Regions:
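Domain-level signal for Mg2+-assisted phosphodiester chemistry and nucleotide/NA-binding surfaces
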Residues: 1-89, 102-107, 155-156, 161
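Nuclease catalytic cores that cleave nucleic-acid phosphodiester bonds
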Residues: 70-181
Length: 181
């Protein structure tokens, strides 16, 4: 977020230079699968999410000072699962599995390589001294080893968890916490 470029120090507005914004994602699921409940064929390449993400990626690669880093989607491991709230109700015997409908399942697919790309970029920026501050906008803690490395090398490491609560032990691995939106 560009709002991280300005901050108040001693009640004065300070602007930082932007080295680059790195955007990490993976291509959307493009395969066709059949819903296990209804048997209906679903072409995920035509879903609203797939269309949105392809369009977003095209816009991002044309944006100045922005690097799009794409991991891989593990399409072979894509499988149908019960939505978490449905699985919980089945396990608690609140609903019978025979009453499950086609909208009670969702596709489960994993992205590969995104965490590694984040860590490599943080390490590269750190060792090449391309920035003195890194702001990571993330909702998970997979970045901890890279953040530790950056901090040991003198980088001011800020986490923007997008207003999500973070575990207390995560504070020891960052220099600051700041959500902007």
């Amino acid at each position: 977020s560009l709002k991280h470029l300005s901050q108040k120090i001693n009640k004065k507005e300070q602007e930082d230079d932007l080295y680059r914004i790195f955007f990490y994602d993976c291509a959307p699921l493009e395969k066709k699968m059949h819903n296990p409940i209804s048997g209906k064929s679903i072409d995920f390449s035509k879903s609203e999410e797939a269309i949105f993400r392809r369009d977003l990626h095209q816009k991002l690669i044309k944006t100045r000072k922005l690097a799009l880093r794409l991991g891989k989607l593990s399409e072979k491991s894509a499988k149908w699962i019960f939505k978490p709230e449905i699985a919980e109700k089945i396990l608690k015997k609140q609903i019978d599995i025979k009453s499950v409908g086609e909208n009670d399942v969702t596709i489960d697919v994993r992205q590969k390589g995104v965490d590694m790309r984040i860590a490599l970029d943080i390490a590269s920026i750190t060792f090449k001294k391309q920035a003195n501050r890194i702001v990571l906008v993330s909702g998970d803690s997979d970045f901890v080893p890279a953040a530790k490395l950056a901090r040991r090398e003198g980088i001011d490491f800020i986490l923007d968890p997008m207003w999500q609560k973070i575990p207390d032990d995560l504070f020891e691995h960052i220099d600051g916490l700041r959500s902007t939106y």
